[in-house]
């Protein structure tokens, strides 16, 4: 088969990356904006815990997609993808206008609009794992890396935007007290605003999601339909049942090939690589679930408690740079992919050690070690970045290894991601938001005797 035109190939990779960008851009954008909104919403330091649970409850999107596939067999995968993209665009647009609206619930103020829209966006993002990834099974395996690069952009672009926005500044001013008893002077916190508001941030996020939806439409126009005849020379054929075995040989993933393999010499496929329920695949899926339980449930719920004692800047940098570690891990996986199960387990152990340190800081809040020092700020930010980068690399490596199992393996990977995230978030909600195991500090109040 003739080589595909370079321009068409590059354009397809670009569209796949932009398509992947829309999968988690909404939730990632909300996460990196937490340091800005947490000081204005009534939930305070517990807001990340609420958000973790809402993202976990977004797994209902997985059930809705499953129900759609059973009730609408043969309808294709385009409809759920378009619904997911539509929810993302409308949800972030409403969030830009309503994020700071507060309403009383059981006599207490809650950011009802923010939490409700966050749940809607979580539904869309969770559903994307079982709609976007299976759609890629129709494409040659190299495009999977472009998709994960796009998912990295869904974290990187909101991070760049958040870095430009800044986190604002807090100053503690001594002002005369308005009371007859007690000290005549009291310390009052003064908040200085960011470079642009959270409203502007969410509008830009809406534009990014619109770009992703447009890329998907462009991808559908560029690629042949599953019922059309394969076009010689495009190299971008959509799989059909009659050509599955032939394409499996022609499009073997470079992530699975030995370094010495050259064009025209295709090794026999390993039968074990296509056994979804083999012991190796089960271990990979289990590791993927555990990794996502930590990164999407356990650790995000306590991030504010581990960082805010060191200041808003520490929290801002930990959230933003930690999210930037995701696309960097994708780039690293494109260059060096760990195919060893033992190696991935070793990396998981390293990530768990870093996570244990961060959990310890959260448990000691509001007076963790090195609070009030530059060393403490550097250490907590660096720990978050390394922890996020390590786990992100593991997730990309496992998903790439499972790609050889085809659409069922990628669907199982999406389920493992969501189940792990759900268990992690549900486990952390009671200690953070009900029993108040983790304590929050107060602005301009020294609770550590420094």
Curated annotation (Swiss-Prot):
Q: Which residues form a coiled coil?
A: none
- What keywords would UniProt list here? Cell membrane, Glycoprotein, Membrane, Receptor, Transmembrane, Transmembrane helix, Transport
Region (Disordered) residue ranges read 227-264
KW Secreted (keyword) present? no
Task: Classify the source by domain of life.
Answer: Eukaryota
Acidic residues: compositionally biased ranges: 242-252
Keyword Transport part of the UniProt annotation: yes
Q: Which GO terms describe its cellular component?
A: plasma membrane
Where are its TM segments located?
14-34, 47-67, 86-106, 112-132, 147-167, 201-221, 282-302, 317-337, 344-364, 369-389, 409-429
What's any GO biological process attached to this entry?
Answer: riboflavin metabolic process
Which family, according to the similarity comment?
Belongs to the riboflavin transporter family.
Q: What is this protein's function per UniProt? A: Plasma membrane transporter mediating the uptake by cells of the water soluble vitamin B2/riboflavin that plays a key role in biochemical oxidation-reduction reactions of the carbohydrate, lipid, and amino acid metabolism. May also act as a receptor for 4-hydroxybutyrate.
Protein's name according to its UniProt entry = Solute carrier family 52, riboflavin transporter, member 2
- What does the organism's lineage look like at the top? Eukaryota, Metazoa, Chordata, Craniata, Vertebrata
């Amino acid at each position: 088969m003739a080589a595909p035109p370079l321009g068409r190939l590059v354009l397809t990779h670009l569209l796949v990356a932009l398509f992947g960008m829309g999968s988690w851009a909404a939730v990632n954008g909300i996460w990196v904006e937490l340091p800005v909104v947490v000081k204005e919403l009534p939930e305070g330091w517990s807001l990340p815990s609420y958000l973790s649970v809402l993202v976990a409850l977004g797994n209902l999107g997985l059930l809705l997609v499953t129900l759609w596939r059973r009730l609408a067999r043969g309808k294709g995968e385009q409809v759920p993808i378009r619904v997911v993209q539509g929810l993302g665009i409308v949800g972030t647009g409403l969030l830009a206008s309503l994020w700071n609206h507060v309403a009383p619930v059981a006599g207490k103020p809650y950011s009802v609009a923010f939490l409700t829209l966050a749940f809607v966006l979580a539904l869309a993002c969770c559903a994307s794992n079982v709609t976007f990834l299976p759609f890629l099974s129709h494409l040659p395996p190299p495009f999977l890396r472009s998709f994960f690069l796009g998912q990295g952009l869904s974290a990187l672009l909101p991070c760049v935007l958040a870095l430009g926005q800044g986190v604002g500044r807090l100053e503690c001013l001594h002002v005369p007290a308005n009371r007859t008893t007690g000290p005549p002077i009291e310390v009052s916190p003064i908040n200085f605003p960011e470079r642009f508001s959270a409203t502007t941030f969410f509008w830009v996020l809406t534009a990014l999601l619109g770009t992703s939806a447009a890329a998907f439409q462009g991808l559908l126009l560029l690629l042949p339909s599953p019922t059309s005849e394969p076009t010689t020379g495009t190299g971008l054929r959509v799989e059909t049942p009659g050509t599955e075995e032939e394409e499996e040989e022609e499009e073997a993933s470079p992530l699975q090939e030995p370094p010495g393999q050259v064009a025209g010499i295709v090794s026999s496929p390993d039968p074990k690589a296509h056994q979804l329920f083999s012991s190796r695949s089960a271990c990979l899926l289990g590791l993927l679930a555990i990794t996502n339980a930590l990164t999407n449930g356990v650790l995000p719920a306590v991030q504010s408690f581990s960082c805010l004692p060191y200041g808003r800047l520490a929290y801002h940098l930990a959230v933003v740079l930690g999210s930037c570690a995701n696309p960097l891990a994708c780039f690293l996986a494109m260059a060096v992919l760990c195919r060893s199960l033992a190696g991935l387990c070793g990396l998981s152990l390293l990530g768990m050690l870093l996570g244990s340190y961060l959990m310890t800081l959260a448990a000691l809040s509001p007076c963790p070690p090195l609070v009030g020092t530059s060393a403490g700020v550097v250490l907590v930010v660096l720990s978050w970045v390394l922890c996020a980068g390590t786990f992100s690399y593991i997730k990309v490596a496992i998903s790439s290894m499972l790609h050889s199992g085809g659409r069922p393996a990628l669907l199982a990977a999406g389920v493992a991601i969501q189940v792990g995230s759900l268990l992690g978030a549900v486990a952390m909600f009671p200690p953070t938001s009900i029993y108040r195991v983790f304590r929050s500090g107060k602005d301009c109040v020294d609770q550590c005797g420094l």
